[in-house]
Amino acid sequence: MPQSKGPFYMTTAIAYTSGKPHIGNTYEIVLADSIARFRRQEGYDVFFQTGTDEHGQKIELKAEEAGITPKEFVDNVSTEIKRIWDLMNTSYDKFIRTTDDYHEKQVQKIFKKLYDQGDIYKGSYEGMYCTPCESLWTESQLVDGKCPDCGREVKPAKEEAYFFKMSKYANKLIEHINTHPEFIQPVSRKNEMMNNFLLPGLQDLCVSRTSFKWGIPVDFDDKHVVYVWLDALTNYITGIGYDADGNSSEQYKKFWPADLHLIGKDIIRFHTIYWPIFLMALGEPLPKQVFGHPWLLQNDGKMSKSKGNVIYADDLVDLFGVDAVRYFVLHEMPFENDGVISWELMVERMNSDLANTLGNLVNRTVAMSNKYFGGVVNKTGVEDAAIDGDLKAVVTATRDKVQAKMATLHVADAITEVFTLFKRCNKYIDETMPWALAKDEAQQDRLAEVLYNLVESITIGANLLKSFMPETTDKILAQLYPANPEAGVRDFDDLATFGLRETGLKVTETPEILFARLDFEKDLKEKVEAIQEAQKKANGVTEYPQVEVKPEITFDDFEKVQFRVAKVLTCEAVKKTKLLKFELQIGDEKRTIVSGIQKYYKPEELIGKKLVVCTNLKPRKICGIESQGMIISAWDDKDNLSVLTLEKDIIEGAEIG
């Protein structure tokens, strides 16, 4: 193995334990995993940390709703989050929980240290508080009276609290950002932080709460708990052994400062303003880079349980497989702008990129090797300089192209480079036409060279795919090197060299289909609808019917229609029909009306009720009975129906309008 290029420490934001993560949340851990795997492949000694953020008022309230303790609640959710991360084949080295004993003790020490040196002081605050975001806002910061971060309702809050002196370190942070352009990426996030927060002037930050108990107690003032951001952000140092008393671990000394904090764009303020200022106050180096990635959205916007449009990773994995999901979220996310996910787009990518471009390439290559040479792949040296040279140039250049993209975290572009290699291999098959060469005895050595070139090219491509689709790489190498798949694993430095496969090795006799083509209507539609229906029921989401707006009428037109209160005197079923026959009292007259609602009501249920009827509808005969008006009902597309009744006891005959 080559010598290590040195330590590389990276983290994701720790997931908040308020519920099961959806595919938008899961995107971050897959993105981080692809970066960590690639850095390991390059030769770095990587430490990759993720975990769960487990304190706060929101969790306290959710636990109360569930009838369990906050610790039981976060234990359940943290286990579920870890299950999803493991399902996605993420190669984290540490999964930290903010309820871990070591973390909690260090947070208390950090709080006390900052208090003792005068960076934290006691005061009180008054403002508008957003419980889901656990953020306090002034009236002027609200957007249409709601939280500027999430758009939810806020409520007035006033309590005693400890505050951190943010303004003390603001100029130092501004200088750091200006002299380290790589610190905040993409650049648009940097501009946002400078212009919206730092340059206008920082307010001191509330770092404790007394209105709830589920948090780390301030040990010298146990009425207070440490506020979420000072608690959560410090996981990045406590997780690798930071000690506020100066006895930090060798691991901490090796890996800090972090090379990369990978977070969602919605929490970049906390990571590029609050976090570096906390570190400055502690006398610790700042992380080298904070990358605020975009969101993965549904077609109709950000995923939300309240919208009923959530897609979960495990549902996608059940239908498409882990690597197909990894490919999709990595490939579809631009560097800076939000990406979009839908079931239909997943099928499109599955068929065009995975089944056709990659799966078909591997299957054809293995099948032809078996058909023409009994699976033995030999290098004969019989080349077409132009065609073979172009293939080799593309293949050997791909490593450096992928590396350049990954260096700037353009992961979607990096994976596209790998698939460009596979597309070039498919073109090579069309150019060389192995089936035609096979018919000419004099071209057998040329045919063997063509198949060797294909197997070698796919081997290099599969190695470069490893960071993004690790299971698929293993499956490809198992088919190309069935006797010893490890023989197909290349050192990163060798991935720009063509021809390292030993001649005479066999491919598998039974090629495996890597990705099967799917038809959304035939294969998935019913399953997807069942998943969506189950989620809506579980989340209590109401699916509203689409409202079809009929042509407008004038007020004069509306006034022509007369609605009145009618009391049901008698009601009976009309035999051999769907009708109920009503005798109604409407003011001083009685009327007969029939209505096709027999399947929804028993006659006795309606006797004595007061209904809404249209009284000036021209009478018509229905099944031989003259109906002198219409009973007004509401119905939906699920075959539910309800006659309109009155909230208060209004005399029959009263006009409605």
What are these regions (language model features)?
Residues 300, 418, 454, 470-472, ...:
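Hydrophobic, well-ordered secondary-structure elements that form the walls
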Residues 2-50, 102-106, 156-371, 414-418:
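Structured secondary-structure scaffolds
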Residues 2-77, 96-111, 116, 133, ...:
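N-terminal catalytic cores of NTP/NDP-binding nucleotidyl/phosphoryl-transfer enzymes
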Residues 476-557:
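Intrinsic disorder at enzyme termini
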Residues 122, 345-382, 394-501, 507, ...:
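Helix-rich, typically C-terminal accessory recognition domains appended to large enzymatic cores
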Residues 78-93:
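A glycine-rich helix N-cap at a beta->alpha junction
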Residues 117-170, 174:
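Cys/His-rich short segments
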Residues 540-657:
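Phosphate-backbone binding interfaces of nucleic-acid-interacting proteins
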